[in-house]
């Protein structure tokens, strides 16, 4: 019998001060549609259209893309998610110069809509 161990990628943590960033947007159909469009076009290739980290480009990435439906992601602050989208890390690009603040908050708002039942903050 052989045993296999799977290396766990350390969780990506935003700096504590990111928690102080507050989402100025209120989720509504317009904000969610805008966030979904941005997410699908820019985040979907790696994170997947449903946010599970299983997009077509995910297989070759290290670290693997986050599952945005997971309790870990859904329990992060909005500010933490905004910071990660803004700053990026290898292999995820920074979107600081690609999207406006409002567009990044739209993506955060959309990520919240991906929560599995019972996993929302």
Which residues make up each language-model segment?
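Short glycine/proline- and charge-enriched loop/turn segments
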Residues: 16-20, 60-67, 89
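Sequence/structural segment immediately N-terminal to covalent heme-attachment motifs in c-type
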Residues: 29-52, 58, 81-87
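Conserved beta-strand positions that form and line the central face of beta-propeller blades
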Residues: 24-25, 50, 67, 91-94
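Electrostatic cytochrome c docking/interface patches
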Residues: 9-38, 121
